[in-house]
Amino acid sequence: MYNFSAGPACLPEEVLIRARDEMLDWHGSGMSVMEMPFTSDEYRQIESHASRTLRNLVDLPDNYHILFLQGGAYAHFAILAMNLGGNHGAADYVQTGHWSTRAINEAGKIIRVNIAAGSEDSGFDHIPAYSEWNLDPEAAYCHITTNETASGLQYHWLPDTGAVPL
């Protein structure tokens, strides 16, 4: 069975067996990865390998850093507002469903949110046409949820927000 949903998916049995076998003793270290101090040589090797692999996979230039962060979507919504909000008065958000609403609610704890466009009144059944958006040219940033997995909406284009970061 193949699962292409946004949540957890099935893994090949070989992967599950390897994970099981290495759960209690990572490569002879005597401990699980979950028990390792993030400052240990073993953990740093794992992180370095993961970073190199990801960098090669997406062809990421060396002038970009890779951060491995915990917290899930809600934490990232807050991190975005905290880091890009700066001294700006507001950020633009386009509300198209479950995840954009969660992003708006989380960012609203940190920065004033301008809902530049949305489709809540029609049950989140479409992405508003760009001509309907009310963008603030002074906004700290503009946030869109490119793939609303809960409602099945997906952008097939990216808006031109001018000098405002998207």
Task: For each feature predicted by the language model, list its residue ranges.
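Short, well-ordered alpha-helical microsegments
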Residues: 12, 76-78, 100-101, 150-152
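Conserved N-terminal alpha-helix of the aminotransferase class I/II PLP-enzyme fold
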Residues: 31-79, 97-98, 106
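Active-site-proximal loop->helix
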Residues: 83-84, 102-112
